From Swiss-Prot:
Textual note on the cofactor: Binds 1 FAD per monomer. Binds 1 FMN per monomer.
Protein name: NADPH--cytochrome P450 reductase 1
The Flavodoxin-like domain, residue ranges: 100-250
Carbohydrate-modified residues: 29
Cofactor: FAD; FMN
Catalytic activity: 2 oxidized [cytochrome P450] + NADPH = 2 reduced [cytochrome P450] + NADP(+) + H(+)
Positions of the FAD-binding FR-type domain: 302-549
TM segment ranges: 46-66
Length: 704
């Protein structure tokens, strides 16, 4: 019988052999070729255990790798949860100091300027208090945040301008709507003490309406009024009104912000003259005055849209001694859109002759290239009075053309800034006198009543040559956009914004011929139809509540003499588009007035076409200089009193557009008379009827 050699391996040896890819054993004592098989057979149980273990081990490794990669992918897809300590704002820090919040709602910057001026003086008087100035538009990101934030206020001031026909300014509109509308909140502001200063014009019907309404609502909701509402009147000297109101405020703040044992007398305060830090530069080789770009998600006053002039034409006949321009802005491919009844804000430059005069008065070369800054060289804010936002680096000529309002009458603060830089002591004293309480009457007569411009005042005081930083921060206010009622409908002209603009050209009491900045630019504009190098302007659309009824079958009554026709041209274009689409329209009457049908009857052919097509039911015209007696739209309203009353009784909407100081007041009185007589009502009930029309949004006015 053949003998075999038994080979017994340890588990360690066998695993080593398997991992190395070979089996190591001693064959020196045998030549049997079946020894490897015998070895494996001898150790088969152990081999099976090891093989299974290796397989399980590999499987575990695979699963582990897969789970790690899956977890990593999941973490990559999910935002990591990072715990960030809550940032404690200055409002939430209770350092024992009393906090005062000063809000402003402004259209031209005056309310903001007063708010900052109050804070600057208050800081000097009450060193232990903390003051902050807040744009109402920035106070809360969402409407539901207003209540939460206001509850935390204990002392607040509101500087509120009234704009247009008793409307809030753009930056205060959202807050005003939230605060004055909606459900009653009860007396939830009992911890708040406040004061309100209004900015308006007594010539307008709704003088300081916004300030009055906010004041009433604050009291209704539990707040305590510190002083009566300040009634700033821009028709006179609004700075004097502000100064007088401040004198009522200080004693109240003394009680609230001074320690009981503080018997010191406040040091007389002299407002610092605001001044930019100015840096002069070599003009860049690629300097581009056109730094305006389109494509913003929203075009507004801070982000206007560059728009070319597509069409321009004169609307008056050659017989007219006046001028009225029809202008069309091209808004195709700009992202700008509008609705019928909206307004367009237009930024234009001062006339070249005006800029030439300003350059001479300042005494620097027109191509001086500079930048203005609101901080020091080390980045710290400039002290003293608050500064308006800076404009981009540019030449002096560009700055005077685009950013300086040099044709309006200077405010008293501007006179003081000029006085501070007058080298002639007599001139300096005279400027200080005009700005003082003692010089109030002379300021009112020599500057306000005479419509004396800033340029004229600087000409009268030639030694007053302020540096650029002072001139642009304290002397010349920022040139503001001009607003126009859009005279087209997007249903008729989706890529165009039409403007109807009367030329402003008049002699002032001082003898100066005043040329309107924007109306003159429009009259001289070069349209695309005449040149590829056409005129253009930065523009933006401001939303209006001047809208046709949502139901086209509701009757409408429109009253708009002269350029007051502008929004109604848009209304009628929209009604024509609706009619052509098969929509049933309600009755529409238009009262239009001008001097003479052969001289200034603007858009006559279009209006007749609206009547022929049924977009307009009736056109009622009044010509003030054709007959022996002058006839105006309010006279025509009286003649149509029965028709007007019947339409109002059917739910008609009544619209008025035009001059607020004259025509709109006359139309309002006539409407009151019609309601009283046709409705057989006494005066108080007629007044209530008209007021209810306004509150219901059925009596709308677009006036200036």
């Amino acid at each position: 019988m053949q003998s075999t050699t038994s080979v017994k391996l340890s588990p360690f040896d066998l695993m080593t052999a398997l991992l190395n890819g070979k089996v190591s054993f001693d064959t020196s004592n045998t030549s049997d070729t079946n020894i490897p098989l015998a070895v494996f057979m001898e150790n088969r149980e152990l081999l099976m255990i090891l093989t299974t273990s290796v397989a399980v081990l590999i499987g575990c490794v695979v699963v582990l790798v897969w789970r790690r990669s899956s977890s990593a992918a999941k973490k990559a897809a999910e935002s990591p949860v990072i715990v960030v300590p809550k940032k404690v704002t200055e409002d939430e820090v209770d350092d024992g100091r009393k906090k005062v919040t000063v809000f402003f709602g402004t259209q031209t910057g005056t309310a903001e300027g007063f708010a900052k001026a109050l804070v600057e003086e208050a800081k000097a008087r009450y060193e232990k208090a903390v003051f902050k100035v807040i744009d109402l538009d920035d106070y809360a990101a969402e409407d539901d945040e207003y209540e939460e934030k206001l509850k935390k206020e204990s002392l607040a001031f509101f500087f509120l301008a009234t704009y247009g026909d008793g409307e809030p300014t753009d930056n205060a509109a959202r807050f005003y709507k939230w605060f004055t509308e909606g459900e009653e909140k009860g007396e939830w502001l009992e911890k708040l003490q406040y004061a309100v200063f209004g900015l308006g014009n007594r010539q307008y019907e709704h003088f300081n309406k916004i300030a009055k309404v906010v004041d009433e609502k604050l009291v209704e909701q539990g707040a305590k009024r510190l002083v009566p509402v300040g009634m700033g009147d821009d028709d006179q000297c609004i700075e004097d009104d502000f100064t007088a109101w401040k004198e009522l405020v200080w004693p109240e703040l003394d009680q609230l912000l001074r320690d009981e044992d503080d018997t010191s007398v406040a040091t007389p305060y002299t407002a610092a003259v605001a001044e930019y830090r100015v840096v002069f530069h070599d003009k860049p080789e690629t300097y581009d005055q056109d730094q305006l770009t389109n494509g913003h998600a929203v075009h507004d006053a801070q982000h206007p849209c560059r728009s070319n002039v597509a069409v321009k034409k004169e609307l008056h006949s050659p017989l007219s001694d006046r001028s009225c321009t029809h202008l069309e802005f091209d808004i195709s491919n700009t992202g700008l859109s509008y609705e019928t009844g909206d307004h367009v804000g237009v930024y234009v430059e001062n006339l070249s002759e005006v800029v030439d005069e300003a350059e001479k008065l300042i005494g620097l070369p027109p191509h001086t290239y500079f930048s203005v800054h609101t901080d020091n060289e080390d980045g710290t804010p400039l002290g003293g009075a608050s500064l308006p936002p800076p404009f981009p680096p540019c030449t002096l000529r560009k700055a005077l053309a685009s950013y300086a309002d040099v044709l309006s009458s200077p405010k008293k603060s501007a006179l003081l800034a000029l006085a501070a830089h007058a080298t002639d002591s007599t001139e300096a004293d005279r400027l200080k006198f005009l700005a003082s309480p003692a010089g109030k009457d002379e300021y009112a007569q020599w500057i306000v009543a005479s419509h004396r411009s800033l340029l004229e005042v600087m000409e009268a005081f030639p030694s007053a040559k302020p540096p650029l930083g002072v001139f642009f921060a304290s002397v010349a206010p920022r040139l503001q956009p001009r607003y126009y009622s859009i005279s087209s409908s997007p249903k008729f002209a989706p890529n165009r914004i039409h403007v109807t603009c009367a030329l402003v050209y008049e002699q002032t009491p001082s003898g100066r011929v005043h040329k309107g900045v924007c109306s003159t630019w429009m009259k001289n504009a070069v349209p695309m139809t005449e040149s590829q190098d056409c005129s253009w302007a930065p523009i933006y659309v401001r939303t209006s509540n001047f809208r046709l009824p949502s139901d086209p079958k509701v009757p409408v009554i429109m009253i708009g003499p002269g350029t007051g026709l502008a929004p109604f041209r848009g209304f009628l274009q929209e009604r024509l588009a609706q009619k052509e689409a098969g929509t049933e329209l309600g009755t529409a009457i238009l009262f239009f007035g001008c001097r003479n049908r052969k001289v200034d009857f603007i858009y006559e052919d279009e209006l007749n076409n609206f009547v022929e097509t049924g977009a307009l039911s009736e056109l009622v015209t009044a010509f003030s200089r054709e007959g022996a007696t002058k006839e105006y739209v309010q006279h025509k309203m009286t003649q149509k009193a029965s028709d007007i009353w019947n339409l109002l009784s059917e739910g008609a909407y009544l619209y008025v557009c035009g001059d607020a100081k004259g025509m709109a007041k006359d139309v309002h009185r006539t409407l009151h008379t019609i309601v009283q007589e046709q409705g057989s009502l006494d005066s108080s009930k007629a007044e209530l009827y008209v007021k209810n029309l306004q509150m219901a949004g059925r009596y709308l006015r677009d006036v200036w």
